[in-house]
Amino acid sequence: YIPLRQKKGPVPWHYALALFLSLIPLLLMKWSEVTTLSLFSFLGLSYLTFRVAQIIIETYDGLISSLSLPAFWAFLLFFPTFSAGPIDRSRRFEEDFRRRYTREEYLTLLGDGLEQLLIGLVYKFVLSALAFRLLSLCQPKGGLLLALAYGWCYGIYMFFDFAGYSRMAVGCAYILGVRTPGNFHLPFLSRDMKDFWNRWHITLSHWFRDYLFSRFLMRGIKGKWFKSRLSGACWAFLLNMLVMGAWHGLTLYYLLYGLYHGVLLAATEVYQKK
């Protein structure tokens, strides 16, 4: 798509076709999850799709004018983050890919990487295991208090399990000279739901914010789809989280999860703006 964009300019249907084609493997995989058909799936497909879609979107916007094949394939197949993120951006990645560190700079990066890797190991294999043991003691059918305790323990288990993996991925990336962004920042200290999604699975929520939420909202404002910017933001939150829920899985559970968070984010926006 990059050579076509350079030659023909920002042609909307070229962009739409390229973006749609990049999403086909992910759509087939999600469809196969809710049917008996095993159409298409492999490890890391979702995150590979995010990377390709980001390049196409930013190429159409004119933010990317060229991308060398070595940098392109290194970005797509970078093994520390290939299977489950964190989700990097191609322009930021390429800067690190081309950078030549001094000995002192790399030793600092190596130390930071080893620290992230060690913390990730403790999160994933010690604290996550302890949280899982607590989880096994709390049966959600044992009454309201036990159900609440189960919910809290499950949230803590999820955090240490995924944050541990993410820190290990970041640590490995640092060791290889790539400053991959982190995925979590004290999410349980969030002030509200908007703050929570700026702290939990950060690279995913920011990807959806930049490439779905903001674009839908700005298009709606320009097209006068909404009565006010506030109502537009509410609709954008609902769409954003529904799509995020569908990305997790095309099941009623995940769609309700997306709708629930969309409503909470919209309600937070209304409360803060009024």
Please place each PLM-identified region on the residue numbering.
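Membrane-embedded transmembrane alpha-helical bundles that form the catalytic cores
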Residues: 1-274
